[in-house]
Amino acid sequence: MTPKELVVLASKLGATTFYGIPDPFRGMSRAEIKAALPQIQHQAEQRGLATMGFDLSFSVNTEAAEIISACTMCDGYLTVDAVIDGVREPREVLYRSDCNSILLRDEHDVITLQK
């Protein structure tokens, strides 16, 4: 998923902050963000992360909701930013809560979450 999709899905689940990743909407006005939402929601639906209803309701699928919520409601997180031989490695963030550990890998335009 994209960073914007991740933040929109997390927001739909009630998150006000997503620690460990840069704000993908930084520099955008409220109007620009609002205009971009339908396209972001459509992309999330195409990836199977969410469902769009006929009444334009938008809901996050159960598996995606479980993993994203574990990140946003974590007890703590660890961010790893590494440079090897002058080449920046993808950012990795480990989120830890009572029963879950989730690894986020941020490769700029693509974010993967792994249990």
Identify the role of each PLM range:
Residues 1-45, 51-55, 59-65:
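Short, amphipathic alpha-helical interface elements at domain boundaries
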Residues 12, 26, 30, 47, ...:
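Arginine residue identity/basic-tract feature
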Residues 51-101, 107-115:
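Accessory beta->alpha helical hairpin/"wing" motif in late/C-terminal subdomains of nucleic-acid enzymes
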